């Protein structure tokens, strides 16, 4: 029963990793862009939530009503005003620009908030638990977190295949020139994709800030977790991203149970093993 609890906790933390990864998977699937600043944008969302909770006196989950649209607007403006100019056959310019953006965000947050760790307080929901079996209890907040992750992935999947915006994403991803001939403004489509990506980032950032301490320097580690979940699941696959996050979470939970120092190492080992056996990931949708 102890190992059942370990695996269950790994599944639940995997939901957070899936939210880290969903935005990466989305923008890579639409515009083949790898956003090096993705982890720092997660941290930025956490700090925006901190500002909202302190200024308005609301709880972190309620702050999502403001943090999500703010991050979406930042994503749209960032893509439309800067990143669209870097897209092309060469993958290096967007990598360099987003790397520079990562440094700017980290140093900006460091100047504004110092290097001190912060944490969002969500109240009684943090300590509320539900009994699964006689010896297994699950926190309400991790359950909510996982449910939100599943809903986010399902929502993105439905948007991609059942809406006009999703058809625009797929058309632009397949062939930009043909999409433009069809009357699509690819710059707007890419900006909408980034806005949607950062909306998911906002949710991930708030849940991260409730779950653990955060500071301006933790972004790169979140990027690695998200990247590993994307690669495990398969590039461009939303449900694969969820599966990748869960596999990564379970791996880390089992590693931590064996030895606390093995938590991160176990996740990296599983990532490398899957990459060696199945380089395209478990459920790939993007090739070439």
What are these regions, as identified by a protein language model?
Residues 1-19, 48, 58-64, 89-95, ...:
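Membrane-interfacial amphipathic/re-entrant helices at transmembrane-helix boundaries
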Residues 112, 174-181, 185-188, 258-288:
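Cytosolic-side transmembrane-helix boundaries in multi-pass membrane proteins
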Residues 85-86, 90-162, 189-192, 254, ...:
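Transmembrane helix-bundle core of multi-pass membrane transporters
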Residues 1-10, 16, 159-164, 190-232, ...:
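Inter-helical junctions in multi-pass inner-membrane proteins, predominant
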Residues 40-44, 86-110, 219-231, 260-278:
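Pore- or pathway-lining transmembrane helices of multi-pass membrane proteins that form conduits
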Residues 24, 57-101, 108, 243-248, ...:
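Alpha-helical transmembrane segments within multi-pass membrane transporters and channels
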Residues 13, 135-214, 238-244:
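Helix-loop-helix "hairpin" substructures at the membrane interface of multi-pass membrane proteins
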Residues 8, 30-77, 81:
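Membrane-embedded helix boundary and interhelical linker motif in transport proteins
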